[in-house]
A protein has these predicted regions:
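Patatin-like phospholipase
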Residues: 1-223, 227-230, 234-241, 245-247, ...
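Gram-negative/organellar outer-membrane beta-barrel architecture
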Residues: 223-224, 228, 234, 240-312
Length: 312
């Protein structure tokens, strides 16, 4: 989804977030070096994805060979970034974070939040802008179904404060002018169409197998790429498949770069039960799978123990 939404705009701005219709910054966290990372350029989808990668909930993403997580770990209210990078006339700050509760024995998410979140400064000088504070104590980290409800709360509060906001703005553009600017910008946004596929990871045969799932004699659309993606990971042989869209100015189309991790070919398991009676059982099983020119699955299992019958 991130690639589908953001790849065309990454291509249009040539990896410089200042060239977007609205200049953008994302904040991520490098937990190894214990510091925040300001993302000003690169892949727009990766930047957005990194800024929401809360530890233990979402997998981190690798940017410039560094695993990065949610920027809120070290800076959950980056007013300093806004001022240093943009020096805006007015900042509208939105605070939805609540004071962390004392860790509870039976609340894993609360324990994780207390472990990873650092204290942030949620102050905004009145001369710098307007601060909105929301009480969302009934909304948890994973309450995605409440997204529209939360957005409406923010919208309604903004409309209620619109007079105060407008009083701080020295000039305005008409809706028609802004709409025309937006149309001109979007007219230069390339369509997400692929004509080449490259695969990194695994051995040669595994890369060829994955590439053939996506490759086509003709350019293919984002929807076709999605179908091939889900088909490739559906059999469980691929542990991770990370796609990136890389724009080619000469062709006007995108290269689909895929980073793959393949499960081990051989998996062995055993189990059984031991009792004080003669009904002891031992089970041994092996599963062998290949990802090559032809995908293959083999299962072998056996058990040792006295035969018995049961009924229910």
């Amino acid at each position: 989804a991130f690639m589908s939404i953001f790849a065309p705009y990454s291509a249009q701005c040539e990896g410089n977030f200042d060239n977007l219709f609205v200049p953008f910054r994302a904040v991520a966290s490098d937990v190894y070096h214990k510091r925040e990372v300001i993302l000003r350029n690169g892949d727009l989808g990766d930047a957005v994805r990194a800024s929401m990668s809360f530890p233990f909930v979402f997998k981190p993403i690798e940017i410039d060979s560094v695993l990065v997580y949610d920027g809120g770990i070290y800076n959950n209210f980056p007013v300093d970034v806004m001022k240093s990078d943009f020096n805006p006339d007015i900042i509208i700050g939105s605070i939805v974070a609540a004071k962390l509760d004392k860790p509870k024995e039976d609340d894993l998410m609360n324990q994780i939040e207390n472990m990873v979140m650092q204290k942030s400064d949620y102050t905004l000088d009145p001369e710098d802008g307007i601060l909105m504070r929301f009480n969302l104590s009934d909304v948890g980290l994973l309450d995605f179904p409440k997204a529209r409800q939360i957005a409406k709360i923010g919208y309604d509060r903004t409309i209620a404060m619109m007079d105060s906001i407008k009083s701080r703005i020295p000039r305005e553009l008409s809706q028609d002018t802004r709409q025309l600017q937006r149309m001109v910008f979007k007219s230069k946004t390339p369509d997400l169409v692929f004509d080449k596929v490259s695969v990194e990871g695994g051995n040669h045969q595994q890369r060829e197998y994955i590439r053939r799932q996506f490759d086509s004699d003709e350019p293919f659309s984002d929807e076709q790429a999605k179908a091939a993606y889900y088909k490739t990971i559906s059999d469980g042989k691929i542990s991770d498949l990370i796609p990136h869209a890389r724009y080619d100015k000469e062709s006007g189309m995108f290269n689909l770069d895929i980073k793959a991790k393949v499960h081990d070919q051989l998996a062995i398991g055993m189990g059984g039960f031991i009792s004080s009676t003669s009904s002891n059982q031992i089970y041994i099983g092996a599963h062998y799978r290949t990802v090559s020119l032809n995908s293959l699955d083999l299962d072998l299992g056996g058990q040792i123990g006295q035969s018995y019958t049961s009924g229910m």
